[in-house]
Swiss-Prot record:
Organism classification: Bacteria, Bacillati, Actinomycetota, Actinomycetes, Bifidobacteriales
Keywords from the named record: ATP synthesis, Cell membrane, CF(1), Hydrogen ion transport, Ion transport, Membrane, Transport
Protein name: ATP synthase subunit delta
Example GO molecular function: proton-transporting ATP synthase activity, rotational mechanism
Gene that this sequence comes from: atpH
Transmembrane domains' residue ranges: none
Pfam families linked: OSCP
Subunit structure: F-type ATPases have 2 components, F(1) - the catalytic core - and F(0) - the membrane proton channel. F(1) has five subunits: alpha(3), beta(3), gamma(1), delta(1), epsilon(1). F(0) has three main subunits: a(1), b(2) and c(10-14). The alpha and beta chains form an alternating ring which encloses part of the gamma chain. F(1) is attached to F(0) by a central stalk formed by the gamma and epsilon chains, while a peripheral stalk is formed by the delta and b chains.
Species for this entry: Bifidobacterium longum (strain NCC 2705)
GO CC term (a single one): proton-transporting ATP synthase complex
Length: 278
């Protein structure tokens, strides 16, 4: 968990630079890729992270380190983002890499906006999450620390070679397995789904069922939960064959479990409570 100083630094930096990053439009693709590369470099070097976050070191020295790291090939916006980040105070050295990754995802979302692909990417990430839920062996290999990042990316491409995914979906999915960042693969995909949902100004409603939802069911769920939360919602449909009947619905931290298993568990608890002597 990030400390207070890091949370403030991340939020203020992204808020202040969001308009400029958004205005880069299709250049945001290049910027996002550069930021993902920098995230990996930082993750691989605690010494570099410390050099860029040392509060006793002048900002000018940190910028000099950045210029040596990035050279003359980085997009000006990438350099501006990194300069802003190294000028801020961080709770822990490694938190700066988290902020760089956040900016990278932001850039990819702005590129999706510029190419009218935001909703498509959000849906594809949800479908990817659902598909991998039923592929435990593949899922485990996608966050196997013993395998090289190249091997994990190659596996992802082989498994999903038959799907025509948007380039943003592909890049985000590959980033998630290329640079694991101490996360399970599906955790990262769910994190990305949530970020896209917030970016689109919607609430994410995750619905888990044994079989895929029909279009009519999704439409009805959108109507019901949009009215309930007071704003448009996006349905994240998850297929889990182990679910026995009914639906498990999650909105934020609130879970409504109407599956057969949940109802049996509730009945069992009720019977036990009633059977307990007063």
């Amino acid at each position: 968990m990030r400390g207070e100083a890091s949370r403030i630094a991340d939020r203020e930096s992204r808020d202040s630079l969001a308009p400029k990053l958004r205005d880069t439009r299709e250049d945001a693709w290049r910027i996002g890729n550069e930021l993902f590369t920098i995230t990996k470099v930082l993750d691989d070097s605690i010494q570099l992270e410390r050099a860029l976050t040392d509060p006793s070191r002048p900002v000018a020295d940190k910028v000099a380190v950045l210029k040596e790291l990035l050279g003359d090939n980085a997009h000006p916006m990438t350099m501006e983002i990194m300069t802003d980040l190294v000028s801020r105070r961080w709770s822990r050295a490694r938190d700066i890499a988290n902020a760089v990754e956040d900016f990278g995802v932001d850039a990819m979302m702005y590129y999706a906006d510029a190419t009218d692909a935001t909703l498509q990417v959000s849906i594809e990430l949800s479908e990817l999450h659902s598909a991998l839920l039923n592929l435990p062996v593949v899922r485990a290999k996608l966050y196997d620390y013993q395998a090289t990042s190249e091997a994990r990316v190659k596996l992802f491409r082989e498994v999903f070679s038959g799907k025509t995914l948007n380039k943003v979906t592909m890049r985000l999915a590959e980033h998630a397995t290329c640079n694991l960042r101490r996360r399970r693969y599906l955790e990262t995909i769910q994190w990305l789904i949530n970020k896209f949902s917030r970016h689109m100004g919607e609430s994410m409603v995750t619905v888990t069922t044994a079989t895929p939802l029909k279009k009519e069911q999704i439409k009805r769920l959108v109507e019901v939960y949009s009215a309930k939360v007071g704003r448009q919602v996006h349905i994240n449909s998850v297929v889990d064959p182990t679910v026995l009947g009914g639906m498990r619905i999650q909105v934020g931290d609130e879970v409504t479990d109407n599956t057969v298993v949940a109802q049996l568990q509730n009945l069992h608890r009720k019977v036990q409570t009633e059977a307990t002597p007063a």
